Structures are given as C-alpha cells and as structure tokens.
C-alpha cells in the first residue's frame, strides 16, 4: 500500500533511524511491527494495552475491540503528523531546521503532546462556563435546550459539554470557573428549599458523582476525558471573578469566603476518591 510523504522527510527519517537504532524506532512508534496492521493486531492480543500503544498518555486501559481500533492507526497518524510539521518547517525555515527539529523530536529532546493528532486537531482549551450556566446546551443543534435550574442539571450539562468539546480536541478541557457556578446553583437550591436536609452532604454528594462520571471511559473509544478544574486563592478569585454577576443579581465578590470554602470541599472530595 503506497504511502506518499515528502521525499526530504523520508530521507531524513531514514538517516535518523539508522543513527539511533530499533529501540528508538519502537519508542517513536515507527517500527514495522507498529506500522503493519497485522503485526499490531497480533501484538495487541498478546500484550497489555499500555505495552502496545505508542501514546503513553492515552488514558486507555481496557483491552477490547474498541480500544484496538482506536490504537491501531496511531503510528500512521503520527508519521503523517511528523511529515506535515517537517514540511511546514522546511517551507518556512529551511531544510536544515526541519531536520534538526525531526531529530530532536525523535531522540526525546522535544516532546509533542498527542503527536498522532497534532496536525489535525487543536490541543487544549479553557472554557468559560457562563453561557452554559445561563443558556444550557446551546451548542447542540436541533435541541430544545433550557438553562439549568438546579445544581444537578448544571453538572449534567457540564458533563455533556466536556464530552462534546473533548471529542473535538486532543488534549485537556479546562473548566476555570466551574466551581464558581456550582457554588451559585448549590446556594440557589439551598436558599429556595430544593434541598432541605444537610447542605454539606448535598454538595459533597454532587461533587462525588461529578468526579466519578468524568472519570468514566466515555471519550474517544476507551478514554476518560482530560479535565482541569481550577482552584484560586482569595486574590485571584477577587481579581478574576469578583465582578461576575449571577442570574439572581448578586455578585461573586459578595461570596469570596464561601467560594474559598466551596473549593476546599471539592478538593476534600477529590482527595477522598483518589
């Protein structure tokens, strides 16, 4: 099966392969046993997923047909990604620079996150959840979405949002103000009598379910989503979110102490689970 790549890239990669040997070739995912689908499938059946995948940060652990199909093409995708980056560097900065980059990437001097998809999809984004909190699942077409009214529905919407956005990027999904909005909906539920029993129990249970659901392998065949939740000290909370107005007309600046405690509860729940 012919695979067409830049000739200078092919020559440079061949020279590097000869210089560093088979061990480096395997580490990079460019060994014939990894590029050949038949050999890969045979190896996948006989080994652990972590020993077969070329992406050690893939967050995939289970051996099944879905994970096999997800991992099978990564060597080819990485090869084409390197070819594309090499071509663009050569075009902009010359062949010598492109060769230097390729060798430094190959020998571990550089590390390209999620290399198999590096030239196809963006890596990480941080998302402001204000619109999600006020409008609901606005990003889904042909969907009669409504703004979340309670903490449970807001967290459900966040899960859907993370799934949607994570499948359109290769890295982490940052949620810098998710705890700001969980605080608002938790306080709203408690003030309006939606939850009348132990308020501390309510938020801890909600956080626990949220964390467990985010860690389910619902992303890209057999991965859990990479999610970053930000924790801020008093000065950052005041500077970044103090002026945020909640839908009820109150401002985040009025609840800084409560927000600090809210963040602490979240971290306690994470610690208990981990």
Regions found by a protein language model. Give the residues of each.
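Catalytic alpha/beta active-site cores
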Residues: 1-274
């Amino acid at each position: 099966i012919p695979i067409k790549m830049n000739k200078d890239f092919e020559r440079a990669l061949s020279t590097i392969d000869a210089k560093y040997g088979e061990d480096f070739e395997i580490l990079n995912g460019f060994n014939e046993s990894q590029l050949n689908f038949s050999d890969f499938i045979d190896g996948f059946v006989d080994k652990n997923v972590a020993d077969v995948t070329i992406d050690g940060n893939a967050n995939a652990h289970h051996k099944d047909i879905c994970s096999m199909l997800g991992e099978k093409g990564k060597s080819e995708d990485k090869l084409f990604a390197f070819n594309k980056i090499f071509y663009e560097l050569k075009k902009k900065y010359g062949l010598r620079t492109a060769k230097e980059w390729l060798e430094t990437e190959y020998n571990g001097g550089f590390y390209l996150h999620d290399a198999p998809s590096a030239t196809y999809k963006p890596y990480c984004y941080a998302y402001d959840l204000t619109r999600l909190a006020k409008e609901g699942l606005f990003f889904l077409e042909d969907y009669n979405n409504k703004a979340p009214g309670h903490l449970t529905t807001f967290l459900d919407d966040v899960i859907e949002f993370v799934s949607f956005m994570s499948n359109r990027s290769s890295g982490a999904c940052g949620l810098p103000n998710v705890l700001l909005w969980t605080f608002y909906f938790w306080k709203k539920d408690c003030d309006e009598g939606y939850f009348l029993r132990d308020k501390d129990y309510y938020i801890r249970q909600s956080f626990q379910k949220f964390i467990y659901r985010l860690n389910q392998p619902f992303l890209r065949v057999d991965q859990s989503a990479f999610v970053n939740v930000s924790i801020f000290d008093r000065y950052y909370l005041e500077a970044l979110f103090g002026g945020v107005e909640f839908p009820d007309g109150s401002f985040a600046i009025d609840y800084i102490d409560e927000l600090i405690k809210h963040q602490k509860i979240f971290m306690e729940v994470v610690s208990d689970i981990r």
